[in-house]
């Protein structure tokens, strides 16, 4: 254990300020970051890592992008926080509306974290419908509000574990539309909203089966429940209009975060006006935040989104993904090792199971011990994947061919080592 991590453990629970950073799922001592640039970070022991976590998907342009850094420095001279509406918020809202192609009947509310945004989405759904129940899907992560932490391992101190006659949250298997439809036929009149990730990223990368997302949204329309699409991970990453554009759907409520802030804390809820105007001060549903719409986060976010709009940006990401992951897929296929590499855009996950998972139960069939050995080998070679078998890893536009070639070789060698192919 490093001296700095020992010191961190004196001050922070587990030495971290967010649990997965402790790297216990992969059984390593977590690195303490000293600095970062482009696709790499350097730890306190002066070891360089190629970063495929990227602040959990926030850094699609890599660390310390010069345009984002310059904008933040310039903005800082005008103030770091106002507690008032600023020009930066308005300019950023205009940028987002233009980027997403939103109609004029939409509105946005800025916040600081994804958890705040999903919590606000649920408050809107319950407040407008007057209904108590929220439906989510097993393995999908929507932040640490009690409403979302019904199942293990998160439920230990959740409100939902209390002995309530009627649970306020129902968790159903992802991709099981017949079961979802059965539940909605029975309880739809009590369901305020259904929240879902269009592409799961917190049980590894799991894709929706054809028709699942469309069916969920259509069923919500039929029952008067709100469809809440959590695009904290997929928004601004998988396409210009996010997953909603790729699947050609219009959920009632959209939630964004991560890339939205350009590396600083920012999130947003986007809805049609007739929904958003129920929020205070226009309506009676309360939501507030001291740092909501922080001017520096708005500045960084505007530059981040503007960079995503550059000609060929998503084509470049797709090329990076193809060149990096296809040879690894080929190695897995030709050797017959029991591993499945799932990728979607610039997200990817290794499941140590020969079968592609469709839900949390499938994902949990992964050989965790084998994943840990694979992870530890890659880590020792200076390749930093997201440190859990149930988290997505991420590519960025900053990943150079040199770094990708090195990491590709390191990952293939690590797979060979785990399965004694060398």
Swiss-Prot record:
The lineage of its organism: Bacteria, Pseudomonadati, Chlamydiota, Chlamydiia, Chlamydiales. Its EC number is 5.4.3.8. Pathway: Porphyrin-containing compound metabolism; protoporphyrin-IX biosynthesis; 5-aminolevulinate from L-glutamyl-tRNA(Glu): step 2/2. It is found in: Cytoplasm. It holds the Pfam family Aminotran_3. GO terms for cellular component: cytoplasm. The keyword Nucleotidyltransferase does not apply. It is an enzyme of class 5 (isomerase). CDD domains: OAT_like. The keyword Isomerase applies. This is Glutamate-1-semialdehyde 2,1-aminomutase. Homodimer. One of its GO terms (biological process) is protoporphyrinogen IX biosynthetic process. It catalyses: (S)-4-amino-5-oxopentanoate = 5-aminolevulinate. Signal peptide: none annotated. Its cofactor is pyridoxal 5'-phosphate. The modification N6-(pyridoxal phosphate)lysine is found at residue 258.
